[in-house]
Structure formats: structure tokens, C-alpha cells
Amino acid sequence: MKKACIALTVIFLLSSLLTVCFGAAVGAREIRSILDGDSSWNHLLDSIKSWHEHGTGQFLGETHMQFPVDSSKPVRLFFDFAKVSVLSTPDQSASMYVRYYGKNSVDDLSSLPYAEQEDGALHLGLHLPDQNSFTEITVEIYLPMAKYTALNAEVGVGSLTVENLQFGALVSSVKVGNTCLKRTSADSVKLVAATGNLAWEDGSRVLKSLSMHTEVGNIQLAWATGDGFRLAYQIGSGKLKNQFEGAVTEQTGSQHESSKGTLTSGDESRAIELSASTGDISLTSFSTKE
């Protein structure tokens, strides 16, 4: 009964969302496809259902591994199911700590994490025998202080946090879960989420370009007051909240319906693109002066 209620609730919410975004006719057709199992949304719903039904399990154990890293080569992360944090360390060696939670014990946890050099890049992730064996996985990756050529991170269900690091290029994709960057700098950044919030927090800076897109979720952008930009935004259903003093706004469409526009500040040397199919976009500022 509980599972049925959960399923109906999810379908109802999705039906409302699709109706708002695409109209009653398209929304009804998509819901019928979901019920028939033929929609692209089915995989996403299965992930959400699995995440909910797992609940919180007992602590099963943890693994720790060290690995060499070369800042001149790309770092690539791939996790189907995990809350991932990428952090800086004053140490010269890189490491990955993983904590596992579940309802039943799992043999040989030490065989799950991997750090492999392939095609000129460092690949980090987990070889999970069965996602259903775990209720939660937390991953902490520590990288020595340096400017890395590139970071490419993919997370299926979970979250991604990157803090106090520097990159040439940074690209992330999270299907279900939030993405947050703190005190991080990069030449170019692209953040994508299917269902989840995107946050670019105080202290994070971009030299050339920043792109943030979520299908369902909010976008929060904190920008340094001295960094000139030209920002293009588009919102399917939601509103723009601009608290960046001095930014010139050009908006088309109503505040609560489909809208798009541009904001500019300073020399406009940095390109920013923000889009949310369903969700709000918030823009704030911070000072780099001490």
C-alpha cells in the first residue's frame, strides 16, 4: 500500500509538472507513456523510487585508497549512486574515502573503488555489483592543491560538491541530485542536472565562461562584483531573482511564466548562460575586497 501511494504521488506531481510545462494534451500523453513504461522518464522514476525505498541502512564499512595524480591530465569521475565531494588537501598525494551503508553485509568492499589511468586521463569511480545492495554511499576525493587541466564528473543519483580547487575546464552532469561549487575557480564551467539544484557559491570565480542548466530545480549564482559579465537566462516556469546591484536587466515574458533575457555588468568579458525548465534563478554578489 505504501509503495502504491508513493508511486501515485510521484505520478501526480509529474503530471502536474508536465501539464504546466507542456500543456494539458502533451502532459496527458506523456503520463500515459509513463504508465505503459515507454517514456524516457521511467528510468528517472525508477531511480527516485529505489532511493526512497532504501531508506537509511546500517554502516557496512569504509574503504580508503591513495593514487597518483597529474594536474596536467584530465580527472574523470563516474558514480551511479553516491554523494560525492571533491576537496583540496595540503598533502602531495591524492586519496579517496568511501563509506557504505546498507541493510545487508557486502563481501570485499575493498574491490569496489578504482583509480585507473586510461586514454591520458585519471578515472575514479566504483564497481558496484548491485546498486540495491546499498542504501547510501558517501565519497570524499582529496586532490593536492594545483590547477588541474580538467574535471569531468558524472553522478546518476546522489549529489556533487566541489570545494576549494582550480581547473582549466570543469564539466558536471547529475541526473538526480544537487550540485554545489564552493570557493572553486576555473577558466570554463558547464553544470547540468536533470532533477536537482545548481549552486555556484561565494568565492567561486570563472575566467571565461559559465553554463548552468537544470530541467527541474533552482539555480543560485553568487558572482564577484568586480568580474564583468554578460549573462543570458531562460526560464520555462519560474522567476528571476536579481540581487546583483548595478546589473542591467533586459527581460521578455512575464515574471512567473516563460521568460528570457540578458544582464550585463562591467566589461562583459565573461559569458554566462543559465536555464531552468522548471525552477527559479537567483543572482547575488560578493566582494573580493578584504
Model-found features: residue ranges?
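Short acidic/polar N-terminal linker immediately downstream of export determinants
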Residues: 2-108, 130-144, 180, 247-269, ...
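Short, T/G/N/S-enriched strand-turn elements that build extracellular solenoid repeat scaffolds
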Residues: 63-67, 83-90, 111-114, 138-143, ...
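Repetitive beta-strand solenoid architecture
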Residues: 71, 80, 118, 135-137, ...
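Active-site alpha-helical segments that house and flank conserved acidic catalytic motifs
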Residues: 75-79, 153, 172, 233
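Hydrophobic residues embedded in beta-strands of well-ordered beta-sheets
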Residues: 94, 120-122, 240, 281
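Short beta-strand/loop motifs in extracellular/secreted proteins, especially
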Residues: 94, 149, 229
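Glycine- and small hydrophobic-enriched segments that form the cores of compact globular domains
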Residues: 109-135, 141-145, 171
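Short, surface-exposed interaction patches in beta-rich subdomains
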Residues: 183-184, 188-290
